[in-house]
Every structure is written in C-alpha cells, then in structure tokens.
Design a protein with these regions (language model features):
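Intrinsically disordered, low-complexity polar regions and short flexible loop motifs
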Residues: 453
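Surface-exposed intrinsically disordered loops and tails
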Residues: 493-502
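Bilobed periplasmic-binding protein-like "clamshell/Venus-flytrap" ligand-binding domains
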Residues: 34, 150, 477-493
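Short hydrophobic beta-strand that contains or immediately precedes a catalytic carboxylate
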Residues: 447-448
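Formylglycine-dependent sulfatase
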Residues: 1-427, 434-435, 439, 457-475, ...
Length: 504
C-alpha cells in the first residue's frame, strides 16, 4: 500500500500529463473516482487510514508534530496488528507522522523494518523532492532482499510528495530574486527547525514545464458567503506559515503553482516506478495486491485557497484510490460509488483473510463488492471531521467542523472558538467555546448541491428561504454523529492523546 501526501483526485490534470506508474495501476486495476478522506490534516487522516476509525474514535485531532499535539495511541489497533495476527509479516517504510518524534516506535504500532527520520519527512520545504527517492529505494530494497519467502507480507510505504506544494512559491529560485527580503526572513525562521536537515529551504532543482493556461473554475470565489474560518485561515497561514505571497491579481503565479503541483506528482511517480521495478524483478505482480491512495488533497488556487485547511471542499477531500488485486479486480475498470478512507482498512483486512466481524474497531465498509460490480452500493454518506486551528488567530473563529456528503448534497457545520495547539504543538490556551454540542445558532453552516454547483460556489445555507432545510440537515448530521461516534462524543477530550502519553 503506497500513500502519497497532499494529492487530490486526478481529474484536474491536463490530458496526457505523463504519470506512467499511476497509469499502470489505473490500466491494470480498479479506480475509485468518488473516494474521500475523512479529515483534511495529515495526521488525523493517516490515523483513520491505518486504524479504520473516525477522528472521534482514534483521537488524533491535529498533526502529530509537537509536545501538545495529539498522536496515535500505542493502544490503537492498526492494520499492522490485525495482519500480524493473521500471520503476515508487516513492514513500513517512509512517512508515518503519527507520533511526535523523529523515531516513532513502529513495533508498538504493529510494523517492522522502519528506518530513517520521520521528522525530516513531516513537510518542510523540499522534503518530498529530497526524500521520496531514498524512501522508494528502501522499499525496493525490502522487496528484493528482505521480504519473507515463507509467509505472506504487507508493506506500507509513505511517500512525501506532492506535499512540497505547501512551500510554493518561496521554494522557487525565481521568487527569491523577486522578493529577496521575504526569502531571507523565511530562511531565518526555518533555520530554527532542527528536524534533521542541513537546509530547510533548498531551491527546487528541476525545470517546471508549463501546462496550465486557465485558472480553476472556482478561483474567483471571494469566500464572503462561506464560513469565516476559510478567510481567516488563509490570512494567518500566509502570515505564520510564510510559503510566499501570491497576489490574487497575478494570474501567472497561480498558473505556475498548478504547473509545480503537477511536476511534484511527476517526481513522485518516478519514485513509485522504482518500487514497481522491484516488483517486476521479483515477479510480484501475479500474487501481490497493490493499493495506492493519499491522505488528503490541496486547493492549489481553487476558491483562491492554498494547501489543505479547515474546510471540506472537493479539492481537499476527494482523493485517489487505485487497487490492483490479481484475480479479483478487472483491468481498466472504475467505479463512482461513494466511498471513504475509513473503508480502506476494513478492505485491506478482509483481503488479508481477517474476520472483520471480530474487529470492532474497524468502522468502515468493505470495498470488495465493487471489485466485481462497479455499480454496487457501499454507503449512503461519507463523514468529514477536523478540529485544528493550525495558526495563531484562527482559534478566534469557528475553526472546527463536521460534515456529511451523500453524493449530491454536502452539509457542514462549523463550531469551535478557543483551545487547540499551533503547528509546532504550542497550546493557544483556554478551552473551546461553542463545542461539538453547541446550539444551531452558534454554528457557521455550509450547504452545497454538487449536481447543480459542482465547484461549490453557492453556499445554500446563506439563503433565508432554506433556513428550515439547514436546520433539518443539522439535526440529521448530529443524529448520524451520535449513531456513528457514540453520544458521548461531545464529552470526548479535545486533546486526544497528548504526545507524552505513549509509554510502554
């Protein structure tokens, strides 16, 4: 199972854009075109991916980066544990990002053979470009020399790109020339991050070909009918994250950003090819199930937003999933069935022979019915959740959200104000006001009809004539949350598992 970072579903790419190794999976397996992450930040999404649990259950509400950020508990039952109990040798290579340390205790999480510095892969500028190749080489070497010959095995690989888009344009040499003072300021700030690298702001070393000539269809969204946190987060991210200033009127800098995002996919695809070369050399395709997905997407200019953040737009939440299962999937097939990250762990466990009915922590539905019937129905609704203010100043607005999407209508409620930690684990102080159980009127609301408005420009929740409908959807979501997460979810600790709680 290969997991990229910050990769959205591929329909935004120009026709003919060369990603041959992803295309190899598409041509030889089943593509899921309506597959969603559960949470927009990296660590909460990865916790769902490897446990099959929702954020409200695994407790990872923020990126596992600093001492106060939550991390995945050693007591969590992961795919590593489930498959080990089934007789599998379970190994992990690359980015984990679920424990706030350079050397996570992967054996406690059910995985062997991990090596490296996880902290270096969390996402500073250029980390995907620098480290995806050695991670892929580790994985290829494992396939050639380490994998067992006398038992089944499961290898999970966490690559970093296209996450480097987080640092566009300040990682581009042409931007350094444009604004040398800003570049020097960012370099000085990043020099204080002792995360195992000699240079925390390297120049992107490759030429970026120009493919894009048009901005996203929803680029001109002014966000004034959207929850306040969308505007606030962008302002504070640009202030504190310092990825480079992008003038809204400078069309070219946004188009170059799309070109760069595509280029990062290409570099990552070459590294996936290194892993596939090892599979070719060891004749592994005939009896190996191969899965590719990502943790979340990236806005890359859609709604004039950058990165992933406290929202549930398609560009961030809809992500790739390709499965090649010899004898089970049909080459070149696709399904638009509504599916979600929480389903993948259940599917992997089932494919490995685990009796998923005896794994109560697996909360998703198996995707295997779609292997033979791409029109099969798996679920009625996917659920979204995130509770991280990220940057100073964001905690002053309703930054947390929970949402549901039924394939046509997407409804999200925004709550919060107060509490939380920043991106390096420093608490903002105070407690969350207007929490999960806050009154309808203490929320911001979103409602989109994606059949009529596929680019999510018209927030129907702002229409006074739909107030009763929004109240009804709010009540439906709250009832679904209680039924799915448990009614005591509203009292569950916002801190999740603090980074110093994992002690064996």
């Amino acid at each position: 199972m290969i997991v990229s970072d910050q990769e959205r579903q591929r329909d935004w790419l120009p026709t003919g854009y060369p990603l041959p190794n992803r295309q190899r999976l598409i041509d030889n397996g089943l593509e899921f075109t309506n597959y969603y992450t559960h949470s927009s930040p990296c660590s909460p999404s990865r916790a769902t991916l490897f446990t099959g649990q929702y954020m409200a259950e695994h407790g990872v509400t923020e990126n596992s980066t600093g001492p106060s950020n939550p991390e995945l508990s050693y007591t969590a039952r992961t795919l590593g544990h489930m498959l080990r109990d089934q007789g599998y040798y379970t190994a992990f290579k690359g980015k984990w990002h679920l424990e706030a340390t350079p050397t996570p205790n992967m054996e406690a999480y059910g995985f062997s053979d991990w090596e490296g510095n996880d902290q270096a892969w969390w996402g500073l500028a250029g980390t995907g470009t620098e480290y995806d190749e050695p991670i892929a080489r580790q994985s290829a070497d494992w396939l050639r020399t380490t994998r067992p010959s006398d038992q089944p095995w499961f290898l999970a690989v966490g690559l970093v790109n296209p996450h480097d888009i987080m640092w566009y344009p300040v990682d581009q040499p042409w931007y350094w020339e444009r604004d040398p003072e800003y570049y020097a300021q960012v370099r000085d700030r990043l020099a204080g991050r002792d995360w195992g690298r000699k240079d925390n702001l390297p120049a992107f070393p490759f030429e970026v070909e120009r493919w894009f000539t048009e901005l996203p269809a929803n680029f001109d969204d002014d966000l004034w009918t959207k929850p306040e946190v969308h505007r606030r987060w962008m302002t504070q991210m640009e202030k504190w994250g310092m990825p480079g200033v992008m003038d809204r009127a400078d069309t070219d800098i946004w188009l170059r950003g799309l070109d760069y995002y595509a280029k990062l996919h290409q570099l990552n695809d070459e590294c996936i090819g290194m892993i596939f070369d090892a599979m070719d050399d060891t004749d592994s395709w005939r009896d190996t199930i191969v899965i590719f997905t990502s943790d979340h997407g990236d806005q890359c200019g859609s709604h004039r937003l950058r990165s992933k953040g406290p929202w549930n737009y398609q560009e961030t939440m809809r992500i790739p999933l390709y499965i090649v299962a010899p004898g089970l999937t049909t080459p070149g097939t696709s399904t638009d069935a509504l599916t979600c990250h929480v389903d993948l762990a259940t599917t992997v466990a089932e494919l490995a022979g685990v009796d998923v009915s005896n794994e109560p922590t697996l909360r998703g539905d198996s995707l295997t019915p779609l292997f033979s019937d791409q029109g099969a129905h798996v679920r009625d609704t996917v659920l979204f959740g995130q509770e991280w203010p990220w940057y100073s100043g964001v905690e002053h607005v309703r930054y947390a959200s929970s949402g549901m999407f039924d394939g046509r209508y997407k409804y999200c409620r925004y709550y919060g104000v107060g509490g939380g930690n920043n991106t390096v684990g420093v608490p903002f102080g105070g407690e969350m006001q207007f929490g999960r159980d806050a009154h309808f009127d203490d929320h911001d609301h979103e409602l989109y009809d994606l059949q009529e408005d596929p680019h999510e420009m018209v927030n129907l929740a702002m229409d006074p004539a739909r107030r009763d409908e929004v109240r009804r959807r709010f009540a439906e979501l709250r009832a679904l949350e209680d039924a799915t997460y448990g009614a005591d979810w509203v009292n569950w600790s916002m801190a999740g598992n603090a980074a110093d709680d994992n002690v064996l």
